[in-house]
């Protein structure tokens, strides 16, 4: 026989009053009203100085149904880390324009906002320094081999800089990169030496333009391409337009067509060619850093160069977690870290300029 308490509970559930009460609650959870409530709570949680639009990172972490609703509402991504305001409070700011120029005589010039407006006397010409660009095209003319003077520009961690060479070629240098180049090119030859990453817009002059790296040599006449040649990483030459010849220096060479990429593992001497979306590999010049199904360790290696940070992992397995996203190059890193946290696969804390990942 059922107990008296069970019978009372059954009678309560079956009562008109209980049914009406819960029917009202059910009606309260219609989708329109529900999402308005969510939006209200989200806006209350929005503590950040700048809004981060959902579409910046939505492909990485947010479920499809939330993508649709948030996109239609055109609302900002909430500060998703309830109870953990440390990531937002401890700002890690993006890099900026800065470099060090070493002249042929050994003199060094710091290129940053403090050097804006300064002039250099080179080859009898006044070279104007801007906070983001150094333009050598004013030092016109060509000289013989005996008179060549080489300068070297080095971009530190957390920096970027644009250089216009004597022939009008524009070079965008990424963080932790350097370029050695002549003040003026010798007759019939244009050659520079690159370490790190740079995006080249080569001016057509009728003479070959050669970029030498530790593992590859790229020869062009007039074209646009990106070279990534960081020590310890795969070397990549990505052709946007024109034509380039890639040579390993070990008897293997090939000619790239637009939208092709040549990659080389240092020391292997073996070049691999594939067709790629060039915008993915050159977007850093336009303010975005793209990642597609990449290991967390590789993602953070790239970001550490730009944000001037160190990265630690409490568990080696975390390095192999894969993500796809893009990061706005000129924003703080906190929104990206918060969205990593939102996956619930990984946790993040900041200790000064070190980012620590743990389970």
Model-derived segments and spans:
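Short helix/strand-capping connector loops at secondary-structure junctions
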Residues: 15-23, 317-324
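A residue-level detector for the "anchor" residue at the start of short, highly conserved motifs
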Residues: 46-57, 68-359
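Extended, compositionally biased eukaryotic interaction scaffolds
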Residues: 7-11, 26, 34, 75-76
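Exposed alpha-helical structural elements
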Residues: 5-9, 33, 37, 279, ...
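N-terminal amphipathic alpha-helical interaction or autoinhibitory segments
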Residues: 1-15
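N-terminal low-complexity or simple alpha-helical regulatory segments
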Residues: 62-64
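Positively biased amphipathic helices and basic secretion/translocation or surface-docking motifs
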Residues: 17-54
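A generic alpha-helix structural signal
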Residues: 1, 35, 39, 300, ...
């Amino acid at each position: 026989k059922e107990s008296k308490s069970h019978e009372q509970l059954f009678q309560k559930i079956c009562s008109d009053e209980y049914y009406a009460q819960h029917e009202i609650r059910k009606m309260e959870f219609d989708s329109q009203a529900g999402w308005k409530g969510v939006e209200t709570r989200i806006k209350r949680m929005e503590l950040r100085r700048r809004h981060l639009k959902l579409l910046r990172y939505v492909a990485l972490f947010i479920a499809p149904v939330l993508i649709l609703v948030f996109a239609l509402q055109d609302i900002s991504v909430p500060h998703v880390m309830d109870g953990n305001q440390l990531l937002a409070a401890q700002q890690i700011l993006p890099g900026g324009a800065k470099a060090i120029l070493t002249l042929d005589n050994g003199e060094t010039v710091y290129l940053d906002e403090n050097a804006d407006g300064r002039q250099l006397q080179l080859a009898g010409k006044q070279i104007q320094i801007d906070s983001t660009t150094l333009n050598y095209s004013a030092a016109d003319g060509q000289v013989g081999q005996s008179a060549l003077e080489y300068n070297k520009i080095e971009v530190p961690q957390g920096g970027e800089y644009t250089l216009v060479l004597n022939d009008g070629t524009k070079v965008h240098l990424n963080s932790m990169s350097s370029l050695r180049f002549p003040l003026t090119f010798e007759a019939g030859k244009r050659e520079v030496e690159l370490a790190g990453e740079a995006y080249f817009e080569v001016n057509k002059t009728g003479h070959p333009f050669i970029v030498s790296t530790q593992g590859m040599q790229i020869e062009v006449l007039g074209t646009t391409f990106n070279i990534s040649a960081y020590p310890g990483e795969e070397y990549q030459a990505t052709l946007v337009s024109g034509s380039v010849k890639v040579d390993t220096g070990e008897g293997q060479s090939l000619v790239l067509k637009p939208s092709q990429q040549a990659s080389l593992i240092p020391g292997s001497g073996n070049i691999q060619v594939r067709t790629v979306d060039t915008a993915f590999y050159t977007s850093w010049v336009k303010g975005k850093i793209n990642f597609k199904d990449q290991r967390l360790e590789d993602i953070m290696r790239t970001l550490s160069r730009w944000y001037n940070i160190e990265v630690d992992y409490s568990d080696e397995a975390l390095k192999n977690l894969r993500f796809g996203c893009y990061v706005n190059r000129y924003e703080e890193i906190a929104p990206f870290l918060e969205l990593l946290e939102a996956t619930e696969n990984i946790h993040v804390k900041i200790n000064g300029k070190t980012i620590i990942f743990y389970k």
